[in-house]
Amino acid sequence: MPPDDRLLMLPTSKTDNRPTTITKLTPFTKQLYTLNKPAKCLPTLSSLALFVGAMLTPLCAQAALPEAIQTALTHAHLSTADISIVITPVGDKDASRLPAPIQVIDSTKPANQPETLTTDDGTAGPSSIQKQALKNNNAKEVSVHQSPLMTIEKQTIKQHARQLHAYTDDPYTYQSIESIPSLLPENALVSAKNHNSSIKDSAKDNESSKNNNDKSTAHSPVIKISFSPLLSHQANIARTPASTMKLVPSFIALDTLGADFVWHTRVYHTGIIIGDKLYGDLIIQGSGDPKMTHERLQQLLYKVQSAGIRHINGDIIVDSAVFKNVTKDPAAFDNSPLRPYNASPDGFLVNFSSIGIQSYPLDNTRAQLTYTPQLANYQLPSMINIRSAACGQARYSIAPQWQPTQLTLNTNLPNSCGEHAFYVAYPDAKDFAARVIASKWQTLGNTLSGKVISQETPYSANNTSDKQTKLPRGLAAIAMSPLPIVSYPSLNLTQQIYDINHFSNNVMTEQVALSIGAYNSTNNPINKAGSNKINTDKASTNKESVNNKSSDTNKVINNQATSLYQFGQPKATDYPQALQTINQWWQTKLTTPPPHLSNGSGLCRDCSISAANLSELLTYAYEQPSFDAYVSSLGIAGVSGTISAHSERLPKSQAIGRAWIKTGTLNNVTSMAGYVKGLSGQDYVVVGIINTDQALNAYNARTVLDTMLDWTAQH
C-alpha cells in the first residue's frame, strides 16, 4: 500500500483514545506549564510531570511488545510501527463457547511417550505444559485448564496437505467445488457441537427459571463481564486487512439472515407443456446462491426434467437481476484474470465461473485433457504435449488463453505434473453460466430449439416473442405469464461461510455480502404484490452463449402485481446498497465506526479496518446465538484451513489445535484474526494486522502472527 494511502483512511474511533492516566494528568500538567513561565527551572519540572504521566500509562495502551513477538518482528525485518495487535479475554473460562481443542499427536515418537499436547519437549503432560508457559511468559503461575481433547495424527495432516498440493495448483478452489470432507473425525465435530449445545441449553434453562420466578417483576438488565485487553498495540490505526475482512460480512450475514438461511433458485415456464415438450421459454431465476456448483446445477436441471419437461420449443432464460452492475475486470487487481479468486459475483453464479482442467499423461510425450464442467459450443483442446519442467500454477504450466470460441494452451505441460487438476477462471460469469447450462441440459438427454440467454434483467411476461407463432394452432391465446415449476434450495448459510472462511473463497464472500443487501428483512421485506419490484436497470447486460450473433433483445418484464414470477423476490441490490446495509448494521450493533469497504472479500487495497474494530466485532459475535456456525467456519491452527501451516512454521506452538483463525495475505499485508483458547481455559479474541509500504516476506511475516497466537495460548 503506498504511504500516502494511510493518510486517507477513515478514523476508527468515535472517542478520545488517549490513555486514561494521561487524560487525568492533563489539568495538572497545564498548571505546571503556567507555573514555568516566571522561573526557568520549572520547564524541567513540567517535562518531568509529562514523563511520569507517560510512564504511568497502562500496559495495554502503550505496550512494549512481548519479547517473543518482538524477536519475530526483528527476524522478519519489520518494525513495531508495521503491526497492530489486540488480544482480549472473552467469556467465562468455566463456560467456554469455543469448540474443544484438537490434540495433534505424533505417532512417530517413541511409543513410551504419552500422546499429549505438543510442547518444546516433544510431548508432555499438564505439568510440563505449565513449566513451558512459565518459561515463555516469565510470568506468574498459569493454572492449566483440562479441556476435552479430540485427537488427530500429525502425519495425517501432513499427508493431506501433500496430496492436495500434488493434485492441484489451487487446493482451496478444489476443496470448495468438490466439497471435500473435513480432515477432522466426525466425532470431533459432533463433540464440539454437543459441548456448545450443553452450554446453551444450560443458559436457556437458567433463563427459563429466571423468567418463571420473575414474571411479576420488571426484567433486570443482563450484566456482561468486560475485560481489559491482555495486549493492545496500535489498536486504532486503520490498516488494510486482506482476507480477514471476510470476518465482517460472514458474521453480519449470520446475524441478519440466520445460520439456516438458504437461497432459492426458482424455475418458471411460459406457454404450455404437452407431453414432455414445453412450447414456451424456461426461465431460471437466479437467487445469488454462492455455491451453485456444476453438480448442483445438474441437479436443478434434473428436477426440471423430472417435472415433465425434456424438450423446449423456446429459449432458456437466465435471470440474474438480483445483483446489478457487480461485474468487474478480473485483471484489475493483480493482473491475474485466470485465477478463480478474481472471479466476478453474479446473480446466477455457476461453479465460481471456473473450469477444472485435468491432465492424464499417456506417455512421455503427450497427455490427455478433460474439462469440468463442459462448455457448449466452445472448443477445448483434448491433448497437450509434455515438456521437462516443474509443475506450477496454470498460467505457467499450460498458459491458457480464452478466445471467443476456443481455449488455447500456449505451452506444453510439465512432465512433473502427472495427473493434475488446474482451475482456470472464465472471464464472463453470464456467458459461462449459459454455456454450462446448455451443455448440462443436453447431457441429460434433453433438447432445446432456441438459445440459452443470460441477462441481468427479469424475464418479460408480456414480451412479443416470435415463438408465439410457433405454438400449435389455438394455443397462441394462452396467457404467457411465467408459472413456477421448480424451487431449488441452496446449501444453508452455515455451510457456505465454512468455505468462505476455511478456504478464503473470495467470490462466495462477494455473493454473501451482496445478499445481505438483497435479503436483509429490515431493508428489503418480503415482496408484496405490487411492491418492491425488481429494478430493471437500463445498463444491464445480455449474454447469449449458444449464439452470440443473435439479434434477440432482452426479454424485459413490466412488473405486474399478479405475476407469480415476482412474488416474494428480494429487491435487486448492488455494491453501494449492500455495503450501506453492512454499515448500518455496524452502527446499530457496535460502538466503533464501521470499516471502510469497497467489496466484501478483502481483495482490495482501498479497504481498511483497525484491529480494535475487528476485535469488537469478534467479541460481539462470541456472545451471539450464531457463534457456533461462525467459529466452526474458521481454520484451526496447525490442523485445517488457511492456518494449517501454522505448525510447520512454529512446530512447538501452544496454539496448535487451540486457535480458530482467519488469515489474510496481500503482497504488503499479512493478517490473522479469530479466537484462541488459553491453557488456563480462558478464551481470547486475537487480531494482528501487518502492513508495510513495500512487498514483504509473507513467510516471515506470518511467523510474527503465529508467535502472537502461541503467546496468547500460553495464558
Model-assigned labels for residue ranges:
Residues 503, 513-524, 562-715:
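Small-residue-rich helix-loop
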Residues 64-76, 110, 141-193, 215-225, ...:
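Conserved serine DD-peptidase/penicillin-binding transpeptidase domain
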Residues 93, 246-253, 316, 348, ...:
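Residue-level preference for non-acidic, small/hydrophobic
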Residues 231-252:
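Short active-site loop at a secondary-structure junction
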Residues 85-87, 265-267, 673:
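Short beta-strand scaffold segments in enzyme catalytic cores
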Residues 2-12, 43-125, 129-135, 140-201, ...:
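N-terminal leader/targeting segments and the immediately adjacent pre-domain N-terminus
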Residues 1-40:
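N-terminal secretory signal peptides that target proteins for export/translocation
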Residues 233-239, 423, 601-604:
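A short glycine/serine-rich beta->alpha loop
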